[in-house]
């Protein structure tokens, strides 16, 4: 399926002004071009990623322009293979293949990767984390966690889940004794290893590219005002910020998001680690100031690991899927009228984003109930 989509994308792009290739892929490739001639990837406007992504895509500058699309598609498949390995430890191999197909054969996932979006790299890193944790390779898992946070900020929250997962039963009579009894050597490995890798990656990139690296890779994302292709309920606020220079409080937008991402692992992290990461990521994306289609990949990668013996396979799960699709369709209709037809539909677009948000909050409740 991915090979067909990759070839279709090449054919389509040659014949249509509306490209199959994601505009972000052109940004990645342009940044890689600057790296190939010894310049900073941040010479390319709107490149807001670690330089490592541009370095990974260097083959695009040497006769293989579709290299990144193949890399992301292969990453998808490797993530699927790791899912099968993880699921096979709990259920039969045949059932593992069935559940992993929700990722491997998912057209949404395949299209996102073959269009040239880099989220598949985060997918393989996320599944590799779980795989290594289950294999008791905690040091290696901690290094991958540190690299993941360097690559994109959001995996930092998985560290909270891992700390809870590796905590020991409470002992002692005083608060301090109970607190100290929770600590374990694996928690220390997670903290030390991830901080070490995160620091090394950042120091290296800062040495090579200086303050623009920090500004565009990290600082930009705390105050970003992207309003195009944004499913978030903050869409209209961000539009006014970007158009009129108004400034809403970013802190208030982050508070519910960060609170949920900390509370969910505290409640569920010990008993269901894959489910905790799924719920954490779903909550993070739902409450994020910017929410685009590729962000759904962040939590969909955990779905096959959560489905076995889950309430999501019941009627409630079907309702969740229906609401998830309907919410996106309603938003996309308004977005098409705005961006392609030039109609003034800001209020309907905001209302459809608000409805999608409420749908996702209901879905989050069902997910938490199933853990």
UniProtKB/Swiss-Prot annotation:
It is an enzyme of class 2 (transferase). GO terms for molecular function: glycolipid 1,4-alpha-mannosyltransferase activity; mannosyltransferase activity; NADPH binding. It is a multi-pass membrane protein. Keywords: Cell wall biogenesis/degradation, Endoplasmic reticulum, Glycosyltransferase, GPI-anchor biosynthesis, Membrane, Transferase, Transmembrane, Transmembrane helix. GO terms for cellular component: endoplasmic reticulum; endoplasmic reticulum membrane; glycosylphosphatidylinositol-mannosyltransferase I complex. Its EC number is 2.4.1.-. It comes from the Eukaryota. It holds the Pfam family Mannosyl_trans. InterPro entries: PIG-M. GO terms for biological process: cell wall organization; GPI anchor biosynthetic process. It is found in: Endoplasmic reticulum membrane. Pathway: Glycolipid biosynthesis; glycosylphosphatidylinositol-anchor biosynthesis. The chain crosses the membrane at residues 64-84, 120-140, 144-164, 190-210, 248-268, 290-310, 318-338, 344-364. Belongs to the PIGM family. Mannosyltransferase involved in glycosylphosphatidylinositol-anchor biosynthesis. Transfers the first alpha-1,4-mannose to GlcN-acyl-PI during GPI precursor assembly. Required for cell wall integrity. This is GPI mannosyltransferase 1. It comes from Schizosaccharomyces pombe (strain 972 / ATCC 24843).
């Amino acid at each position: 399926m991915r090979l067909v989509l990759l070839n279709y994308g090449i054919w389509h792009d040659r014949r249509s002004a509306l490209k199959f290739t994601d505009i972000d892929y052109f940004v990645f490739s342009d940044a890689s071009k600057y790296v190939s001639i010894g310049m900073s990837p941040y010479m390319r406007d709107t490149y807001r990623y670690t330089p490592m992504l541009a370095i990974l895509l260097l083959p695009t500058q040497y006769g293989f322009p579709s290299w990144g699309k193949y890399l992301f598609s292969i990453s998808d498949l490797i993530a699927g293979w790791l899912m099968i390995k993880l699921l096979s430890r709990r259920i039969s191999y045949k059932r593992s293949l069935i559940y992993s197909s929700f990722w491997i054969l998912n057209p949404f996932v395949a299209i996102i990767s073959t269009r040239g979006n880099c989220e598949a790299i985060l997918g393989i890193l996320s599944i590799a984390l779980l795989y290594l944790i289950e294999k008791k390779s905690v040091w290696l898992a901690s290094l991958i966690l540190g690299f993941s946070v360097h690559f994109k900020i959001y995996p930092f929250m998985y560290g909270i889940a891992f700390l809870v997962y590796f905590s020991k039963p409470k002992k002692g009579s005083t608060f301090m004794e109970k607190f100290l009894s929770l600590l374990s050597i694996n928690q220390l490995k997670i903290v030390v290893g991830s901080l070490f890798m995160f620091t090394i990656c950042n120091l290296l990139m800062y040495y090579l590219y200086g303050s623009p690296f920090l500004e565009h890779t990290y600082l930009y994302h705390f105050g970003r005002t992207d309003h195009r292709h944004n499913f978030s309920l903050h869409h209209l606020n961000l539009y006014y910020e970007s158009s009129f220079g108004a400034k809403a409080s970013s802190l208030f937008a982050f508070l519910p998001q960060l609170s949920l991402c900390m509370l969910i692992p505290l409640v569920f992290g010990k008993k269901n680690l894959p489910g905790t990461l799924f719920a954490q990521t779903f909550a993070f994306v739902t409450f994020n100031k910017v929410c685009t289609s590729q962000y759904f990949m962040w939590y969909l990668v955990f779905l096959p690991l959560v489905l076995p013996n889950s309430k999501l396979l019941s009627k409630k799960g079907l309702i969740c899927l229906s609401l998830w699709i309907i919410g996106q369709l309603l938003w996309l209709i308004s977005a098409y009228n705005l961006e392609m037809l030039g109609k003034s539909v800001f209020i309907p677009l905001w209302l459809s984003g608000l409805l999608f948000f409420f749908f996702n909050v209901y879905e989050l409740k069902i997910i938490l109930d199933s853990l």
